[in-house]
UniProtKB/Swiss-Prot annotation:
It comes from Haemophilus influenzae (strain ATCC 51907 / DSM 11121 / KW20 / Rd). PROSITE patterns: DPS_1, DPS_2. GO terms for molecular function: ferric iron binding; oxidoreductase activity, acting on metal ions. SUPFAM superfamilies: Ferritin-like. This is Uncharacterized protein HI_1349. Gene3D superfamilies: 1.20.1260.10. It comes from the Bacteria. Belongs to the Dps family.
Length: 160
């Protein structure tokens, strides 16, 4: 069995890097969507939502960098072209969204998509004995589960 420079199985690491590149794409498209919500939100809840979306997209920028660096740590190259991201992202571009309910719903659905994808990667990383990736995914999942709860609550009482 051939090993990577950090002692992981090369075949499993290559597959994990592919999964992480798909996650990177999902994060990048979600980031762009949330940035658009921040710019274009309208309505009575503008100030609160404008600030919340900025908080979220700022966090997403950090996650993008961390996922890309994990791919590099595994010995592979992160995708860096937006055209690649659009092909493999599990989230599609959200175009011309400005109503609060749509922005909240888009954010909630994006978070749920990330959770599903990260849980798949967590399971694969655990099977590959990749504690670094597993720990990273576990941290993201914990953080995003709380955000899902908050956005579900916000979607129930949203005013357009």
């Amino acid at each position: 069995m051939s090993k990577t420079s950090i002692g992981l199985d090369k075949v499993q690491s290559a597959e994990l890097a592919d999964k992480l590149n798909e996650l990177l794409a999902t994060y990048q498209v979600f980031y762009t969507n949330v940035r658009g919500y921040h710019w274009n939100i309208k309505g009575v809840n503008f100030f609160a939502l404008h600030a919340k979306f900025e908080e979220i997209y700022t966090n997403l920028v950090a996650r993008v960098d961390e996922v890309a660096e994990r791919i590099l740590t595994l010995g592979y190259t992160p995708n860096n072209a937006y055209s690649q991201y659009l092909k493999i992202s599990r989230i599609k571009e959200d175009i011309a969204v400005s109503e609060a309910q749509e922005c909240l719903s888009g954010t909630l659905q994006g978070l749920k998509t990330l959770l599903d994808q990260q849980r798949e990667i967590l399971a694969f990383a655990n099977n590959a004995n990749d504690e670094g990736t597993a720990s990273q995914m576990s941290d993201y999942i914990k953080e995003q589960e709380k955000l899902v709860w908050m956005f579900q609550a916000a979607c129930q009482t949203c005013h357009n």
